[in-house]
């Protein structure tokens, strides 16, 4: 794990509970103690302006909100991964999270694809949450619901 060549997150006091959770293979979110809304890394609730947020374990499930396939390495650590993807995941709890889709050919990634979190221990200190297609995902022949048709 010591030869990881890609950029690593900056872990500070505000984000430490998130990264400690990832190390335990748990996806952590903040939740408003007043209204229950979930957030990724915020300082107060967007809905009720409550500043009392608590860290809670998330379900780890979500859907692909949007994604991009990179055919050029913008950092030398990614050159052997070309083409690689990045995705914005809409978590079941509501927040959006930028990550990667693993265990799925890039050609099969679609907006609305159900996903679940997996963890990659990249160094002795850092574990990255990534996502893979959920076990209950539709087959490639099953069209995904159109926008506005519900979940």
What are the roles of these predicted feature ranges?
Residues 1-27, 133-134:
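A broadly conserved sequence feature marking short terminus-proximal activation segments
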Residues 23-61:
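Cys/His-rich short segments
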Residues 54-55, 87, 105:
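Short, conserved secondary-structure segments in the cores of folded domains
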Residues 67-73, 120-124:
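Short, conserved beta-turn/loop elements at beta-strand boundaries and strand-helix junctions
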Residues 94, 99-136:
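Well-ordered alpha/beta subsegment
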Residues 135-151:
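Intrinsic disorder/low-complexity segments
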